[in-house]
Design a protein with these regions (language model features):
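A broadly tuned "polar low-complexity/structure-edge" signature
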Residues: 2, 7-10, 100, 107, ...
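Conserved active-site neighborhood of the chymotrypsin/trypsin-like protease fold
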Residues: 57-66, 77-157
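Short loop/turn microsegments at loop-to-beta-strand junctions
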Residues: 70-72
Length: 160
């Protein structure tokens, strides 16, 4: 056909695009992404010792006690108070916390609020680490946050 030319992708005679050099904008973007990654890594290193995996036993519909589920929690005081979700521990007959150092200890319910889906547990044992609670008043809508959990026993799962 007049005006058309067929070339193959590996045609050695085809002109090659010039290699692009990184621009200041792409370099700045890469630097910002790397800085963000380092910030997330630092946050995980600091908080991961405070994250626990919770295994919950409870009564089933037939009245027998068995596994009801699992979840994550965070130790928020040096004396072993744990914050978790109410739906994780509601109706539990027994709660076991696996700590970041591998120990499994009994977690005792202190209180829960199903309306806010929050619960507090207590570990009567030494803890490998704790993460103090911050203030939500210090946050702004759209601000980036890091969530660290231990779903199904997968250690230090991160959402950032």
């Amino acid at each position: 056909m007049p005006g058309y030319e067929t070339r193959f992708l590996l045609d050695a005679s085809a002109p090659r695009p010039e290699a692009s050099t990184p621009t200041a904008a792409s370099s700045a973007g890469a630097d910002a992404l790397d800085a963000y990654s380092r910030t997330v890594i630092d946050a995980v290193r600091a908080a991961a010792p405070a994250v626990v995996h919770l295994r919950v036993l409870g009564k089933g519909p037939d009245g027998t006690v068995g596994p009801r589920g699992s979840g994550s929690g965070v130790i928020f005081t040096p004396d072993g108070f744990v914050l978790t979700n109410s739906h994780v521990v509601n109706g539990a007959t027994s709660i076991t916390a696996t700590l970041s150092d591998g120990r499994s200890v009994v977690a005792w319910p202190v209180g829960e609020d199903p309306d806010t889906d929050l619960a507090v547990l207590r570990l009567h044992d030494s803890v490998p680490g704790w993460a103090p609670l911050g203030s939500s008043a210090a946050l702004q809508v759209g601000q980036l946050v890091v969530a660290i959990g231990n779903p199904l026993g997968f250690e230090a799962t991160v959402t950032a």
